[in-house]
Every structure is written in structure tokens, then in C-alpha cells.
Amino acid sequence: MRHGKAGRKLNRTASHRKAMFANMAASLIEHEQIVTTLPKAKEIRPIVEKLVTLGKRGDLHARRQAISQIRDVAVVSKLFDAIASRYATRNGGYLRIMKAGFRQGDNAPLAVIEFVDRDVDAKGSKDRARVSAEAEAAEAA
């Protein structure tokens, strides 16, 4: 029986899962939006939500806890400076998961996970062009 066994193994060892989630959390905080498989998105969401809550706490111990989890000081400083101040008044629910079809090679369900009030410029020039094109299309319609 699997009573009380939460979380997905994602066909990886525990150390591989831990490293993958650390890398995914760092990428999500840096770019504020990533495309991944739906199960991975569902697993990374509570990890990043807890990191944002640590960022809102803002003290040295919280910063060290965040560094121990995602191991990238530049990303942690963005988390504590930019992202934590953006969500200072929001109590949870910092991320959204949107289904994004299926991957071409193996038909795996894809999802876009992003911050709710994300900074469009964080993703890069390609995303900025897409967002501006969508805005122009909505304006024309």
C-alpha cells in the first residue's frame, strides 16, 4: 500500500531529483517562466512557493536556507530583492501552471509554469517579441 507517500519519483534517484529541482527552481526564478513536463511543473511549484516565502522573510537565515536549496547566489539575490518585494502583499499562489500541449518526440504532456505577475523582460528578447505581438493582435481585434 502506498498510503501517505506523497510526491513523484519521476524515474530518477533521490539525488538526481534534488539536483533537478534545484536547477529548475533557479531557472524559474531567473527567467520567471519555463516550459517543462506537467508532472515536473506540479512538483516544482511547492518548492518555489516556499522559496518565495523565504524571500519575503528576508533575514540572513532565510537567505542561507534558500542558498542551500538552489545553490546560485545571483538567483537568490534576485529572489530576495525583486521577487519577494513584488509579492509582499500576496499570501501564497505566486505561480501558475498552464497546460501547453504535448511534446513532439514522446507525446509527453507539457506545461508552462510562470510567476503570476511576472516581469516580461526576464525571459529574453524572443518572449518580449511574442508578448508584444499578442498585445498588438488583441489591440487590432
Swiss-Prot record:
> Does Plastid count among this protein's keywords?
no
* Cellular compartments per GO CC: cytosolic large ribosomal subunit
Which UniProt keyword terms apply here?
Ribonucleoprotein, Ribosomal protein
Q: Cite a single GO MF annotation.
A: structural constituent of ribosome
- From the UniProt record, give one GO term of the biological process aspect: translation
Q: Does the keyword Ribosomal protein apply?
A: yes
HAMAP family in alphabetical order: Ribosomal_bL17 (MF_01368)
Question: What family is this protein classified in?
Answer: Belongs to the bacterial ribosomal protein bL17 family.
**Quaternary organization:** Part of the 50S ribosomal subunit. Contacts protein L32.
| Name of the molecule in the record | Large ribosomal subunit protein bL17
| Gene name in the database record | rplQ
